[in-house]
Amino acid sequence: NGQWFAAFTGTYVTNPSSLDIDHFVPLANAHESGGWSWSSGTKSSYYNDLSDPQHLIAVTDSANSSKGSRGPDEWKPPDSSYWCQYADTWIDIKVRWGLTVTSAELTALESMLGTCDGPPTGVYVLPAATSTTTNTATTASTTLTTTVVPNPGNTKNCSDFSTYIA
């Protein structure tokens, strides 16, 4: 019993079966933007990266299905208030892993960064979770720590990454 924040939709989810753990930069996108040249060890490090709390994040299964392997030039989170953080995180992961961006991807990222209130900080502050069990609302701050990655379903499995063909 608990709550998980689904960043792409800006909602709290209480049913864990409606969540997916998503590679922020999808495996196919990473492959196409330079991951194809990685050793199997580097690929394994990428798809199991728990050193960055934004690399693998909890999202609603519907948002994850909608995003698929698309980059920001083809898909944006439904919650536009998350666009600044989304672009900042996307860029951070691409830079950290030495991945490239297309010109269309760069244009989309620049547009999304244009929604920032100031320079991106790299820190996303979760909105307060509210619940009403009586006539009064209670507010709590929630931090999500994920250590076990569930099966991503029948779309692409992490083990498929090493077999991607350009």
Label for each model-derived stretch:
Residues 1:
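Active-site acidic/histidine clusters and adjacent loop/turn architecture
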Residues 130-148:
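Extracellular mucin-like PTS domains
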Residues 4-130:
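Domain-level detector of nuclease and nuclease-like folds
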Residues 144-165:
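Extracytoplasmic/periplasm-facing segments of secreted or lipoprotein envelope proteins
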